[in-house]
């Protein structure tokens, strides 16, 4: 399988998806036709989200079609060279994909060789479940099971920063809560600016920041770019 799982879409001082373009270009390998799944977008229309994505990827010669705009979305996915899943609200994303019967077709086409690109919520969707999202559950997706393209859980936008005077939990504390009730999980705290690529049977960590892996009953393990999972 070929996957590009990004923690986020924007970095300070850079345009939207600018940091991701070289990574996408490296994994295209001749693929030029993409379907875009915009369902995580809540405060922007799916048309606008698709147009925004298409404009950025045009520089790589990739044509983008919004899955919401086609007559037969399942067929569009089955014939896709690239499946792109944008960030936003993960619960809304999973709900829409489940209701439209898209989860199994996405899994199948990626296993057959399509490239999967997802950022933030799109990276969450590639995991076994969406239980490590940071998002508010604004809708009920009728279960948390997701695509299971990547075998570990990703927590995008990972940071342990706590504003002075703030009494809420840190991100690690919330992850530890999940590991109490689901100790079988391995959770990757993927900070902004980092990504995971899957290619030729290997999953490799990229990006300038330290990533952390959490397991029940163990200290967090710091990982740097180049680590293979």
From Swiss-Prot:
<feature type="active site" description="Charge relay system">
    <location>
        <position position="157"/>
    </location>
</feature>
<dbReference type="InterPro" id="IPR005320">
    <property type="entry name" value="Peptidase_S51"/>
</dbReference>
<keyword id="KW-0378">Hydrolase</keyword>
<keyword id="KW-0224">Dipeptidase</keyword>
<keyword id="KW-0963">Cytoplasm</keyword>
<dbReference type="GO" id="GO:0016805">
    <property type="term" value="F:dipeptidase activity"/>
</dbReference>
<protein>
    <recommendedName>
        <fullName>Peptidase E</fullName>
        <ecNumber>3.4.13.21</ecNumber>
    </recommendedName>
</protein>
<dbReference type="GO" id="GO:0006508">
    <property type="term" value="P:proteolysis"/>
</dbReference>
<dbReference type="InterPro" id="IPR029062">
    <property type="entry name" value="Class_I_gatase-like"/>
</dbReference>
<dbReference type="GO" id="GO:0005737">
    <property type="term" value="C:cytoplasm"/>
</dbReference>
<feature type="active site" description="Charge relay system">
    <location>
        <position position="135"/>
    </location>
</feature>
<dbReference type="InterPro" id="IPR023172">
    <property type="entry name" value="Peptidase_S51_dipeptidase-E"/>
</dbReference>
<comment type="function">
    <text>Hydrolyzes dipeptides containing N-terminal aspartate residues. May play a role in allowing the cell to use peptide aspartate to spare carbon otherwise required for the synthesis of the aspartate family of amino acids.</text>
</comment>
<keyword id="KW-0720">Serine protease</keyword>
<keyword id="KW-0645">Protease</keyword>
<feature type="active site" description="Charge relay system">
    <location>
        <position position="120"/>
    </location>
</feature>
<dbReference type="Pfam" id="PF03575">
    <property type="entry name" value="Peptidase_S51"/>
</dbReference>
<dbReference type="GO" id="GO:0008236">
    <property type="term" value="F:serine-type peptidase activity"/>
</dbReference>
<comment type="similarity">
    <text>Belongs to the peptidase S51 family.</text>
</comment>
